[in-house]
Amino acid sequence: RGVPAPKPKPVRKVRPKQRIAISHHREEDFKADGLRAYAQYRDLGIAEASHGLAQAHVIRLIGPCNPAEVSKLHFHDVEFQMVYVLKGWVKTYMEGQGETLMKEGSAWTQPPRIKHLIMDYSDDVELLEVILPAEFKTVELAS
């Protein structure tokens, strides 16, 4: 009888070294080039600094809210997503949670692939969103 072979150690993916990212508020950094046409995004430099591990941006939703445009059920194929309300309020629907009014200071996580939508928001709403990984797919669903 031979001695059983040792279990192989899991291969750990080596990521490039992360760097420091500093982002100061500048109005000109808000761009209408993101996922939603009714939003402006301020990239905080996290995706580049983390080599795609994570993404963080400030989202400014453009008012007034048009529910016909924004209330589209969808999900994101992500590993992690969290949102923090910096200013104003946003009313959301999340599968398994229902409708929730998030006000300044509110924070929430959305599990991977959870179906959700925005129902309404204040004209001054700003959100901080952190997502892993930085590149991900969004899937629009039939209502």
Describe the predicted segments one by one.
Residues V58-I62, F75-T92, V130-P133:
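Short, conserved beta-strand element in jelly-roll/cupin
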Residues R1-C65, E140-S143:
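A short, N-terminal "cap"/entry segment at the start of jelly-roll beta-barrel domains
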Residues G96-I114:
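Short acidic-glycine-tyrosine-enriched beta hairpin
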